[in-house]
Amino acid sequence: MEQNFTLDQIQEVVTAAWAEGKDIPIWAFYAAMGTGKTTFIHALCTMLGVEDAVSSPTFALVNEYQYEGGSLFHMDWYRLGSLEEAIRAGIDEHLHSGDTCLIEWPENVPDLLAGPVFEIRLSRIDEKTRHIYSRVKS
């Protein structure tokens, strides 16, 4: 998928992304700070019926949410500095759980991403408009 969208259109974009990537358990979100990674994940969780408050797990590293299809692990790897640190934090266990993992800042520990990954790349066009490009990377 590749398109421009506004916040008013985010539910449509999230629905299309889920249709494209729902069978891939690892989702990697690439975007600059403030582009809307957490906003996108919040909209996705809303679409999936998550009732918990959705927020960026910058300090906790991982937030777990429940939805009808099971568990979602929302991860923020911004503060991770190495593969060893990620393993000590138990990140690899979530990645191998088979549950959906939504990862912000995956570029900080790229060696953890094995197998198929649903990549979502967001960029800012202007104050109200974002661009999304998604693909499955083997």
Residue ranges: model-predicted function:
Residues K37:
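Conserved lysine of the Walker
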Residues W18-I24:
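Phosphate-binding P-loop
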Residues Y30-A32:
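P-loop (Walker A) phosphate-binding loop of NTP-binding proteins
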Residues M1-A17:
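N-terminal pre-Walker A segment at the start of P-loop NTPase domains
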Residues V50-Y65:
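Short beta-strand-centered segment that lines the nucleotide-binding/catalytic pocket of NTP-utilizing
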Residues M1-Q3, T46, E84-A86, D92-S138:
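Short phosphate-coordinating micro-motif centered on Lys-Gly-acidic
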